[in-house]
Amino acid sequence: MVPAVNPPTTSHHVAVIGAGAAGLVAARELRREGHSVVVFERGNQIGGVWAYTPNVEPDPLSIDPTRPVIHSSLYSSLRTIIPRECMGFTDFPFSTGPENKSRDPRRHPGHIEVLAYLKDFARKFKMDEMIRFETEVVRAEPAAENPKKWRVESRNSGDISDEIYDAVVVCNGHYTEPRHALIPGIDSCPGKQIHSHNYRIPDQFKDQLNSGSSVSGVDISRDIVNVTKEVHISSRSTKPETYEKLSGYDNLWLHSNIETVREDGSVVFKNGKTVYADTIMHCTGYKYYFPFLDTKGEVTVEDNRVGPLYKHVFPPALSPGLSFIGLPWQVILFPMFELQSKWVAAVLAGRFYSKLEASCIPKRYTHLMAELDSQFVYDNWLADQCDYPRIEKWREQMFYKVFKRIQSQSSTYKDDWDDDHLIAEAYEDFVKFPSNYPSSLIEREYTS
């Protein structure tokens, strides 16, 4: 997908909130359209959630609203669920090369490699000159003197800045503010409780129970299983009678949903089984959270639905001055970020603008692309709006293949695959682009 040269368009002064993958590609696409861009990043480096830290929050459940917030939810051994070939931006392949000896060459690399890729991307497109590091947006709202413009208040080392922008693009991610399941009796549990947001390494666990059976929840369970006596996974998506030992492990069980937690530390499942847990880890996902955003009620978050939004991006009453990148989940994230960003940049420039409509989709799963096909319908719609090539067929098929492998070989899918023909197709496309890795690699140690 070689990007086209865009004709002269209207230029705007745009604030991008967040310098993770979404914020980086949004800034690039906005600048390509001729906009003036400032990226606000509260951390001291790019990467967003991919910037790993061993630090955790003092409140292990992350409930206390006054707690110091740790942005990243990565654990030390995390590897990508999606293969690198289909994970990268369309014109900046997440490939490997023989010259990159210190890099992680695995198809499902660790988080260090993803951050290195994003740093390469930022270096390639000279992103640092647009980013204000250690600068937190504390308030963004329509300007009182001109509601079509946006007032952005930011803080850096105690200094407050107040600026006016033509538009705000929200790219702050949604893997920082934990969600918690409503479990009867959970408040009386005498054992330790932790949300997976604060999980880093397995050494601290003994008898462990995980509430939540998403792919990441199961991966964490496998990370813990070798250092703990037993791990029991609770899943609300299984049948009530579910009770099975997971293949390849003698101490890892899958249960149905939790019925109740008792004061003696016992946990009763819907299947009738009872276990005693030293620790309950809540692998229950995250909330959409925009504490800095004041839209005077035009955009709300209710039951984990951000709305009303047109195509997950523009709130009709505030478009095109306010937009969101990256809300859908269970998708191939980076290419979707890229296509959404192209659309936002083009709409702000006065190209491809279509009338925005309020969404009437049921709330909780508004941003879930539950049907595997739905994300590609959406991505291709975005591509069509921008006169950009549609998502490659090999990328679609690779995504389908990995989800089949997750279901059939969940413990080995990251290291055992049968889609070499798709890898070959991907690398045939990748040769259209210059190497995405600079000659001098990022200076850091990589431990596989």
UniProtKB/Swiss-Prot annotation:
Protein name in the entry: Putative flavin-containing monooxygenase FMO GS-OX-like 10
Needed co-factor(s): FAD
Role this protein plays: Catalyzes the conversion of methylthioalkyl glucosinolates of any chain length into methylsulfinylalkyl glucosinolates.
The enzyme's E.C. designation: 1.8.-.-
Origin organism lineage: Eukaryota, Viridiplantae, Streptophyta, Embryophyta, Tracheophyta
Key word Transcription present: no
Binding sites annotated in the UniProt record for FAD: 18-23
Family: Belongs to the FMO family.
Keywords: FAD, Flavoprotein, Monooxygenase, NADP, Oxidoreductase
